[in-house]
């Protein structure tokens, strides 16, 4: 009896590699990929391996009649490392990255999940610790929490178009606290001591790109800003560094993720909005001066000669880009092309 991979993105492809290693026969289904979108009789499959991004109602429906597994469920069952799960609306990647640098001083460490390699690619690879960045999608679909350490950094409204309400999003995030040991601590040095029982020497911790990253003395690339909470954090930092009313904010992305919530922008001298969702974003904003452009290049041409720029989109990429990485790279490229000549 065959199994089925449901969703053929990054996680789906890791399921494929995993099942091939296990000599398990399988089919693939993904409604968004024509080669794999033909209708399936899901009841005929022995197991269904589900990617985290599939809609939660589809997942709930599959679970009624099938044995459904996620990559996290499999990793929990098979891997023997000490498992540290980290989640939060913001700064989870940075916290994972910083904690990994501290633990790696003395012990072997996997950095996996949303931040690194898919978890299935690193099962029992000999590392002592596994630091796993977990999204609300993964936590929502996780059958049972077998983490040794679960860390919830913060919660603010996000992914509301998936969870349907902030309360459901919060419930998903808080599942991480069902670990053997749980914490709300965010300082990586305190987390290191809590987990290992040792103090770490102070390091010059490396940061991830596109998180309030200065690409020039007066230009910040914060492309990782995909929600209003991270946007407000960036504005607070910019208000301190550049001073209020002394910088321009550039925004873009899809506001449907936050159900078109109204946001009041205080700090920048002007807000520049561009992209396919520009009209939707403009309707969500309150600011004394909002300038709207079709594309990023036109936005930067307008800003040429102006002092201090904060690129903090505040929304996920939507129709404009594949992801925040592509968005951030495009911003860096156009800054060089438009502003450096």
Where are these regions (language model features)?
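Short glycine-rich anion-binding loops that position phosphate/pyrophosphate groups of nucleotides
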Residues: 52-55, 91, 136-138, 157-158, ...
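Conserved substrate/cofactor phosphate-moiety recognition/catalytic segment
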Residues: 29, 108-125
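C-terminal helical cap/extension that packs against the catalytic core
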Residues: 255-308
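Flexible active-site lid/hinge loop adjacent to a nucleotide/diphosphate
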Residues: 126-186, 191, 319-325
């Amino acid at each position: 009896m065959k199994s089925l991979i449901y969703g053929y993105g990054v996680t789906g492809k890791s399921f494929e590699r995993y099942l091939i290693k296990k000599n398990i026969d399988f089919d693939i289904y993904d409604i968004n990929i024509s080669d794999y979108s033909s209708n399936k009789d899901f009841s005929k499959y022995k197991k269904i391996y589900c990617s985290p991004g599939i809609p939660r109602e589809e997942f709930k429906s599959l679970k009624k009649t099938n044995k459904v597994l996620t990559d996290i469920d499999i990793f929990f069952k098979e891997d023997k490392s000490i498992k540290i799960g980290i989640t939060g609306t913001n700064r989870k990647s940075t916290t994972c990255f910083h904690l990994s640098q501290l633990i790696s001083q003395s012990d072997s460490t996997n950095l996996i999940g949303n931040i690194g390699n898919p978890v299935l690619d690193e099962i029992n690879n000999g590392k002592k610790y596994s630091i796993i960045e977990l999204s609300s999608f993964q936590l929502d679909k996780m059958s049972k929490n077998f983490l040794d350490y679960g860390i919830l950094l913060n919660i603010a409204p996000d992914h509301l178009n998936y969870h349907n309400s902030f309360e459901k999003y919060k419930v998903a995030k808080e599942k991480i606290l069902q670990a053997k040991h749980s914490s709300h601590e965010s300082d990586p040095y305190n987390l290191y001591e809590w987990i290992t029982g040792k103090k770490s020497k102070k390091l010059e911790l490396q940061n991830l790109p596109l998180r309030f990253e200065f690409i020039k003395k007066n230009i910040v690339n914060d492309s990782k800003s995909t929600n209003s909470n991270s946007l407000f954090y960036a504005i607070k930092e910019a208000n301190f560094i550049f001073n209020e009313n002394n910088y321009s904010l550039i925004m873009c992305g899809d506001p449907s993720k936050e159900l078109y919530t109204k946001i009041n922008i205080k700090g920048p001298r002007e807000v520049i909005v561009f992209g396919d969702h520009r009209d939707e974003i403009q309707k969500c904003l309150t600011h004394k001066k909002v300038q709207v452009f079709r594309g990023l290049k036109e936005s930067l041409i307008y800003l040429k000669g102006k002092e201090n720029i904060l690129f903090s989109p505040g929304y996920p990429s939507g129709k404009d880009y594949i992801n925040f990485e592509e968005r951030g790279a495009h911003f860096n490229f156009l800054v060089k092309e438009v502003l450096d000549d």
